[in-house]
Amino acid sequence: SAGFKAGVKDYRLTYYTPDYETKDTDILAAFRVTPQPGVPAEEAGAAVAAESSTGTWTTVWTDGLTSLDRYKGRCYHIEAVVGEENQYIAYVAYPLDLFEEGSVTNMFTSIVGNVFGFKALRALRLEDLRIPPSYSKTFQGPPHGIQVERDKLNKYGRPLLGCTIKPKLGLSAKNYGRAVYECLRGGLDFTKDDENVNSQPFMRWRDRFLFCAEAIYKAQAETGEIKGHYLNATAGTCEEMIKRAVFARELGVPIVMHDYLTGGFTANTTLAHYCRDNGLLLHIHRAMHAVIDRQKNHGMHFRVLAKALRMSGGDHIHAGTVVGELEGEREMTLGFVDLLRDDYIEKDRSRGIFFTQDWVSMPGVLPVASGGIHVWHMPALTEIFGDDSVLQFGGGTLGHPWGNAPGAVANRVALEACVQARNEGRDLAREGNEIIREACNWSPELAAACEVWKEIKFEFEPVDKT
């Protein structure tokens, strides 16, 4: 038979191409590959390239009907991971034609699809992706971005302050709205629905939206500042999600929220388009991310999920804290914080960035620091995250001994003190505690907060330092 030989052949014969020069239009991926014993690194890397692009386990005669050279993924470089036995970084280049325009869903179905269950691999982790401008330009991206958000809110020169309303489940809509009002009245910019607040028997979504809108307008009238509450529009169907977003728009509130991993990228992109068309900001929560990103040798690093979110669309996204209860190693966290905010990010392996990423004109996303943080953390957070961030204190506001509003006052005073000290040229890292103590002298609310949280630390070694 001419030109076709049935049977199984090594992937590396076709898909391992160390001489390949990557194109500007290729999507590049860096995989951490742990081959099964006896499987050579080149074969494992080639298998990843094949199974996430055009390959299948055997030769098929329909290969002759297309141009493999044009469409196949290529493993173009492999390097051993220093300090790890039998772990390699395999670099794979994918031709742009393999992916549907404007669909994170399709991109992930290929790149992190079936290949993760592949038998020749003991484990596989996607560490980073390089998205070429020729692909990122097919996405709308964030509904508004950092600059437009500041203009909408009329807040400049400092991080924004938020608070998740607790207890996360069980409050009635009226009491929930009351808690929102107190926090906003005290000086916060935003309050937040918890990620698992959708529309449960104790509080249906429409009631919550109404009482929260009332709280926002009352707090705005009293403070003269623009306020917001992240109304969680996440729902069981896309239609229901959009219905909730429409109601939020009708109420005239500035921002809604979505759980982008549990809701899914298709739903998220749908909502992001609606938000841009209707002037709503979109806050993104990353519930379920640790299922995907916490294992060091398998899954996907959060920096990839963060890039995907910037493409799919969101104006805020949770990004760990570096200092609180939820995990985050400083350099790695700052690496993907930059990937969210900046236009152009240089390759820097010490920060986990495997590829130079050029977002061209795609708007940036505000990173949200949230989880176990309180007033004593304020200098570190201001120093680490800078102005373009949202600092979110849940228990750190509502746990104040005098109530929610004084808790909000304490956080706002601490933030303003840190920003002023920084602008005066003081060193927040060294003088942080002193700056907070000085501010306590003219804010009894802050003094009370400092007393409550003076000893609390979450001291665990982070799991993932890579």
UniProtKB/Swiss-Prot annotation:
Active-site residues, record numbering mapped to chain: 166 (proton acceptor), 285 (proton acceptor)
Protein keywords: Calvin cycle, Carbon dioxide fixation, Chloroplast, Disulfide bond, Lyase, Magnesium, Metal-binding, Methylation, Monooxygenase, Oxidoreductase, Photorespiration, Photosynthesis, Plastid
N6-carboxylysine carried by residues: 192
GO cellular component terms, A-Z: chloroplast
Post-translational modification: The disulfide bond which can form in the large chain dimeric partners within the hexadecamer appears to be associated with oxidative stress and protein turnover.
Binding-site residues, Mg(2+): 192, 194-195
Residue ranges crossing the lipid bilayer per the database entry: none
Catalytic activity: 2 (2R)-3-phosphoglycerate + 2 H(+) = D-ribulose 1,5-bisphosphate + CO2 + H2O; D-ribulose 1,5-bisphosphate + O2 = 2-phosphoglycolate + (2R)-3-phosphoglycerate + 2 H(+)
Positions with a binding annotation for substrate: 114, 164, 168, 286, 318, 370
Coiled coil: none
CC cofactor: Mg(2+)
Chain positions with N6,N6,N6-trimethyllysine modification: 5
Localization terms from the record: Plastid, Chloroplast
GO molecular function: magnesium ion binding; monooxygenase activity; ribulose-bisphosphate carboxylase activity
Annotated cofactor note: Binds 1 Mg(2+) ion per subunit.
InterPro entries: RuBisCO, RuBisCo_large_chain_AS, RuBisCO_lsu_C, RuBisCO_lsu_C_sf, RuBisCO_lsu_fd_N, RuBisCO_lsu_N_sf, RuBisCO_lsuI
A Pfam family reported for this protein in Swiss-Prot or TrEMBL: RuBisCO_large
EC number: 4.1.1.39
Gene3D superfamilies in the record: Ribulose bisphosphate carboxylase, large subunit, C-terminal domain, RuBisCO large subunit, N-terminal domain
One record GO biological process: reductive pentose-phosphate cycle
Further comment: The basic functional RuBisCO is composed of a large chain homodimer in a 'head-to-tail' conformation. In form I RuBisCO this homodimer is arranged in a barrel-like tetramer with the small subunits forming a tetrameric 'cap' on each end of the 'barrel'.
Function: RuBisCO catalyzes two reactions: the carboxylation of D-ribulose 1,5-bisphosphate, the primary event in carbon dioxide fixation, as well as the oxidative fragmentation of the pentose substrate in the photorespiration process. Both reactions occur simultaneously and in competition at the same active site.
Subunit description: Heterohexadecamer of 8 large chains and 8 small chains; disulfide-linked. The disulfide link is formed within the large subunit homodimers.
Family: Belongs to the RuBisCO large chain family. Type I subfamily.
Protein name as annotated: Ribulose bisphosphate carboxylase large chain
Gene that this sequence comes from: rbcL
